[in-house]
Each structure stands twice: as C-alpha cells, then as structure tokens.
C-alpha cells in the first residue's frame, strides 16, 4: 500500500436544525431519557432540548453499525477491532442481507434501532456505482444525493435518530488507506509532527458571476481565523480571492506542511474550489503523508458523491 499520501475521507454526516417547541429525541420524554442509558453522541442534544442536567442522564458509548457490500466484509477485521477498542459494540451487516435498495437498507437500519436503542453510528461502505456500489437517496430538481434520509426513522421530524457516514470507495486500496488513516489519526496523530494539529488553513473567495458580489465568505473566514486562534491554534494560513486567483500554489504547501483543519467558503462545485482555484487534479500534488486534516467545504456539490464528476472534490481529497 502506497502511504506517500493518505487521503482524507470526509464522513458525510447528516446535520439537521432543531426547530420548534416540540423537539424530541426519538420520541422520548425527559423521564424516559433519565431512566435509561443514551448514546454518547447525543448527549448535548438531549441536555439542551430537554433542559436536563448532566447528572440526570447516563450517556454511554453505543453501537457502531457497518453495512458493506458482501465482498468487502472480509477486509474489515482490523477496523472492527479498532472500533471495539474505542468502546463501541460493532455490528456488520452484508448489503445482500440489508437489501439492495435505499428503502430496504433504511428499513434494516430502522429494525436495528428498534432492537438496539443504543445504536449510535451507521457507516455505509461504497460509492453509488462501480466497484462497491451502495445506493442512496436523491432530492430536488437537480437530483442531489444525500444519505440523510437513512437517519429519519422515528416520527415526522428532520432530526437524525442516528449519525451516519459513508466511505465512498472505488477500490480495495481506497479502503485500506482510509482505514489506516482513521486508526492512525486516533491512536498516534502526533507521531510525525507534534505541532501540526495546532495549525490550520482557511480559504475563501468573494466572487459572483453577477452583482452584487458577496462579501460574507471572507468576512466569516476572518471571524473563523480569530476563533481558532483564540481557541488555541498557533498558526492559521489564509488564501483569499481577491487577490489570489490561482490558489493551488499556496494551498498545497500549507497542507503538505501539516494543518489540522482546512475550511473553504466561496464558489465551487464537484470539480473543486474556483475562487481561489483548487481542483481535483491539484489533489495529486499533495504530499502530506499521515498529516491528514479535517476538510470543510461549504459550497455546492463539493461533496456530491453521485455527481458526473467522479471523483468529486471531497472524494478526491
């Protein structure tokens, strides 16, 4: 396995705004939540929306469900052991058992939640086509892809009942590299550089193809830079348009040097960021080894893993 560059995988997690006066966690009352364990990842949501004190609930590490194409399961042993070492109970279900349509897979997740109220995370393995095909849901006139519907199980609200992620792999090599990166990031992230997690990179572009030209991408990015420095980061690199149009010559060295977080806000699509430019082809010039940052890309289609541009920006990173 070539570890010259460890690819970042973006766990595409479904976020929902908790709106209204009747927000509930899986339809539970506060009395029910205080009388039984709850999955650890939902602790803050439960406390904030039920006005429950930390001493009144019993959050515990829950169940980590993996659903994978049948031919992938034999390669998951080390990753399953790793998740067990983090305190998770891990269940692995073959895609042939879960069902080969999105609606059937959602029913499998719902049945698992009914059997195991400590279900916390669901990990889907595979792209929507190709080597490890794994279906998803599509929305709107542009047929945008999203796994969020898998998380809407109980009630008619938009609140996720589980957290979900997808490893959009196109080969066994992709899978091996992603699993190695994930385990190394948790077990010994500072092995090769003791300071890299205290550095960050913020990229932004104030651009529009019509007036008025937005100003908030750079404004919010200046705010984020200050927030990170106040939080304890030692160095935040910035690459902004204007004045920089060709961003890759500045972005690549910053990432190769090691940064814990990369954030972009501006103008882009599945090909990557356009102002300043950093596209899927530029990813091949990254040589950051085990120093794999968390990427945030707040622009249309950069995470569209079903786009005709394949791999999309996030998949290539």
Named regions from a protein language model:
Residues 1-4, 148:
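Generic cytosolic/nucleocytoplasmic N-terminal low-complexity/intrinsically disordered segments
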Residues 3-16:
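Sec-dependent N-terminal signal peptides
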Residues 21-317:
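Cysteine-dependent hydrolase recognition
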């Amino acid at each position: 396995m070539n570890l010259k560059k460890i690819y970042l995988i973006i766990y595409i997690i479904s976020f929902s705004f908790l709106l209204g006066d009747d927000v509930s966690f899986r339809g539970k009352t506060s009395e029910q939540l205080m009388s039984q364990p709850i999955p650890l990842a939902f602790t803050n949501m439960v406390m904030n929306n039920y006005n429950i004190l930390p001493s009144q609930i019993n959050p515990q590490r829950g169940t980590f469900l993996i659903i994978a194409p049948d031919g992938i399961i034999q390669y998951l042993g080390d990753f399953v052991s790793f998740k067990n070492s983090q305190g998770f109970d891990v269940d692995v279900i073959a895609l042939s058992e879960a069902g080969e349509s999105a609606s059937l897979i959602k029913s499998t997740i719902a049945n698992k939640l009914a059997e195991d109220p400590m279900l916390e995370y669901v990990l889907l393995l595979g792209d929507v086509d190709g080597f490890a095909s794994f279906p998803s849901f599509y929305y709107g006139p542009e047929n945008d892809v999203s796994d969020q519907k898998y998380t809407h199980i109980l009630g008619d609200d938009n609140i996720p009942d589980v957290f979900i992620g997808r490893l959009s792999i196109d080969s066994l090599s992709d899978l091996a590299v992603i699993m190695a990166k994930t385990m190394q990031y948790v077990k010994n992230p500072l092995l090769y550089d003791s300071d890299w997690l205290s550095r960050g990179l913020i990229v932004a572009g104030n651009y529009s193809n019509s007036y008025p030209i937005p100003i908030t991408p750079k404004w919010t990015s200046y705010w984020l830079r200050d927030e990170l420095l106040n939080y304890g980061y030692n160095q935040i690199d910035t690459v902004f348009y204007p004045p920089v149009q060709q961003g890759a010559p500045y972005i690549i060295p910053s990432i190769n040097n090691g940064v814990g977080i990369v954030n972009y806000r501006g103008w882009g699509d599945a090909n990557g960021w356009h102002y300043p430019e950093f596209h899927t082809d530029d990813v091949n010039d990254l040589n950051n080894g085990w120093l794999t940052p968390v990427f945030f890309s707040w622009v249309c289609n950069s995470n569209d893993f079903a786009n005709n541009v394949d791999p999309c920006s996030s998949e290539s990173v």
